[in-house]
Amino acid sequence: MKTWYMVVVIGFLATLVQTSLALKEEDCEVCVKTVRRFAESLDDSTKKDYKQIETAFKKFCKTQKNKEHRFCYYLGGLEESATGILNELSKPLSWSMPAEKICEKLKKKDAQICDLRYEKQIDLNSVDLKKLKVRDLKKILNDWDESCDGCLEKGDFIKRIEELKPKYSRSEL
């Protein structure tokens, strides 16, 4: 009887760990949003056949730009794509698998798929710089064509942005 309870507890913990490790939309935003948008564009008859899904995806990719275009390139949806893992998208879509799960599978095949990110537009007048990631602080400086020599910690980047803020916030108005 104790063994049975132990098996149930271990099974529950394994499920709990698996759900906490599941891919979130913000971890792979371009993939999730593109797959959702593509899936919504398909009619019911196309959704059932993975070959038709692949053909529709290639047609869909011809109209995409920027990050979505790069996503299509990684999957093999473009003529100039070097590799093709399109069946990793089309078959799960034909099974009605959610976009997050599809992107999780795609990430296992090609990690750079989830490295694609949309550019964040940061309003410096309303944002709390302390809550931003260092990557976003570096992006602000990079957008201004400024550097932060010797900046190692988040506080250093915030200090540099605060120094330059008057110069750039006036020109944006």
Swiss-Prot record:
Pfam families, per database record: ARMET_C, ARMET_N
Keyword check for Signal: yes
Keyword vocabulary terms for this entry: Developmental protein, Disulfide bond, Secreted, Signal
Signal peptide region: 1-22
Location of this chain's protein in the cell: Secreted
Any one GO biological process: synaptic transmission, dopaminergic
Keyword Signal in record: yes
InterPro entries assigned to the protein according to its UniProt record, in alphabetical order: ARMET-like, ARMET_C, ARMET_N, EF_Hand_1_Ca_BS, SAP_dom_sf
Predominant place of localization: secreted
Transmembrane segments: none
Record GO cellular component, one term: endoplasmic reticulum
Disulfide bonds: 28-114, 31-103, 61-72, 148-151
Superkingdom per UniProt: Eukaryota
Reported function: Required during the maturation of the embryonic nervous system for maintenance of neuronal and cuticular connectivity. Essential for maintenance of dopaminergic neurons and dopamine levels.
Family as reported in the entry's similarity comment: Belongs to the ARMET family.
Designated name of the protein: Mesencephalic astrocyte-derived neurotrophic factor homolog
